[in-house]
């Protein structure tokens, strides 16, 4: 019989990417990681990375090395919206440019394999249903 007064143990879902645990994913080389990804990501990495994405990764490494353990690293600003999030970037803080401002994005494990631009919206969503000039002209004036 289970004791009714005992607190329930909470179980948290462990993150895994295509069956690979987070700990193994972070230690995995990029070539091995690309084999787990979809065709678009594999194609992007097989064609090679030029100096700009590698420069971003170097800046993220430097920002992480400059911080103490269990602290948030400094924000690294970038215009590279087409950069694919790799496991090495998990825990970093990136300022992604949306055409106007840099939106601060903390890289979480669920973001692996997605583009940075997906996390920094470039437009203001439309708000429908608000009274504007056209609908207010039928209001009686005092």
Curated annotation (Swiss-Prot):
Subcellular location: Cytoplasm
Keyword field contains Cytoplasm: yes
Major location category of this protein: cytoplasm
GO molecular function: RNA binding; structural constituent of ribosome
GO biological process: ribosomal small subunit assembly; ribosomal subunit export from nucleus; translation
Keyword Cell membrane: no
Cellular component per GO, a single term: cytosolic small ribosomal subunit
Pfam families: Ribosomal_S19
InterPro entries: Ribosomal_uS19, Ribosomal_uS19_CS, Ribosomal_uS19_euk/arc, Ribosomal_uS19_SF
Keywords for this protein: Cytoplasm, Ribonucleoprotein, Ribosomal protein
Recorded coiled-coil stretches: none
Record's subunit section: Component of the small ribosomal subunit. Mature ribosomes consist of a small (40S) and a large (60S) subunit. The 40S subunit contains about 32 different proteins and 1 molecule of RNA (18S). The 60S subunit contains 45 different proteins and 3 molecules of RNA (25S, 5.8S and 5S).
HAMAP family: Ribosomal_uS19 (MF_00531)
Protein task: Component of the ribosome, a large ribonucleoprotein complex responsible for the synthesis of proteins in the cell. The small ribosomal subunit (SSU) binds messenger RNAs (mRNAs) and translates the encoded message by selecting cognate aminoacyl-transfer RNA (tRNA) molecules. The large subunit (LSU) contains the ribosomal catalytic site termed the peptidyl transferase center (PTC), which catalyzes the formation of peptide bonds, thereby polymerizing the amino acids delivered by tRNAs into a polypeptide chain.
NCBIfam families in UniProt: PRK04038.1 (NF003121), uS19_arch (TIGR01025)
Similarity comment: Belongs to the universal ribosomal protein uS19 family.
Protein name: Small ribosomal subunit protein uS19
Protein source organism: Candida albicans (strain SC5314 / ATCC MYA-2876) (Yeast)
Lineage, highest ranks first: Eukaryota, Fungi, Dikarya, Ascomycota, Saccharomycotina
Gene name per UniProt: RPS15
